[in-house]
């Protein structure tokens, strides 16, 4: 089964939020698994029965096609590959916005806090090569069309670095600046250096795919455990217990 429980939030995902004729729904790969899982659930309520049906839930079908950046239509969805060209910005509400370049076209991207992948988005830097997927939101009076992201796949990370004062190996200390354009000098042994050194910084994100927490999944969002699975087909068996009345 999949998407039955969000362990990060300790939240049950089997049951509807509002009053509903459906008491719970188990998502799984085949009818045998669903029947077995259903027997493990022991509700206090008296249920009328169950029905097993096939759907496109958890298939990622809406993100199988590549978006045409020259025909960036609202309410369409798909994937894009591009390079980050604008440093991510974080709003007061915790949402993250950044831009990528795809075939010389700038695409604005949004990652919303409920997805729980904002921590990934805000760590992106200019030069990161990504594959992203989501739906295009229509333009408003205050915002242009934007791609609302449902996943971020980091294909190649750009190296992150900063300039630091030169390090004196003799004294095991960083040198001090002698003044603007005057270089650096060790205060102990007086060794000098003309330039700062570049220090590379370990990135907190990795070259992998990031998807929202389970509780933030949309109907079609493909869970991690299904990412590498090939499409399965189970033919209907009229003798199986696909429909049962208690």
Region spans (language model):
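OB-fold and OB-like single-stranded nucleic-acid-recognition modules
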Residues: 1-246
């Amino acid at each position: 089964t999949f998407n039955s429980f969000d362990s990060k939030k300790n939240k049950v995902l089997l049951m509807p939020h509002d009053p509903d004729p459906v008491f719970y729904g188990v998502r799984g790969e085949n009818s045998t698994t669903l029947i077995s899982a259903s027997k493990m659930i022991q509700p206090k309520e008296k249920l009328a029965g169950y029905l097993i049906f096939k759907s496109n839930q958890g298939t990622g079908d809406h993100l199988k096609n590549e978006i045409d950046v020259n025909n960036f239509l609202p309410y369409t969805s798909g994937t894009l590959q591009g390079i980050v060209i604008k440093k991510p910005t974080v709003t007061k509400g915790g949402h993250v916005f950044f831009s990528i370049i795809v075939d010389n076209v700038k695409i604005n991207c949004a990652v919303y806090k409920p997805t729980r992948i904002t921590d990934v988005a805000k760590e992106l830097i200019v030069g990161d090569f990504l594959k992203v997927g989501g739906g295009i939101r229509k333009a408003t009076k205050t915002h242009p069309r934007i791609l609302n992201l449902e996943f971020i796949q980091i294909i190649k990370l750009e190296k992150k670095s900063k300039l630091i004062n030169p390090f004196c190996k003799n004294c095991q200390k960083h040198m001090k600046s002698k003044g603007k354009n005057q270089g650096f000098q060790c205060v102990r042994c007086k060794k000098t250096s003309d330039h700062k050194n570049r220090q590379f910084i370990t990135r907190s994100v990795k070259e992998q795919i990031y998807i929202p927490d389970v509780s933030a999944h949309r109907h079609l969002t493909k869970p991690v455990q299904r990412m590498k699975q090939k499409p399965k087909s189970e033919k209907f068996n009229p003798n199986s217990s696909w429909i049962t009345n208690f």
